[in-house]
Amino acid sequence: MYNLIVKKSVKKDIEDINRDDLQRIADNIRVLKFNPLPPGVKKIKKGKEFYYRLRQGNFRIGYRFDSTEKLIEIIYVRRRSERTYL
């Protein structure tokens, strides 16, 4: 099982999300703790680092993980738009 870190900026990202969507997002994040690469995850390269994006309806969950340290960092949760993608 992976440890989970959520960036402070994610709290701002989720302020305006309705309760039902927020519950589904939280469920997907819980799944990441056990499987950091579930079906449907897209690998994104930015510079020399790799990030991953998980789709949840109209929302995207951006994260990165370190398998050696068993750590997952949630970077953003955003409604799908042009600025969503890194």
Model-found features: residue ranges?
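Enriched for short, Lys/Arg-rich terminal
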Residues: 1-5, 9-12, 16, 20-23, ...
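Residue-level recognition of specific faces of alpha-helices
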Residues: 13, 28, 40-43, 73
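Compact soluble domain cores
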Residues: 21-33
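A short, surface-exposed loop/turn module that caps and links secondary-structure elements
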Residues: 30-53
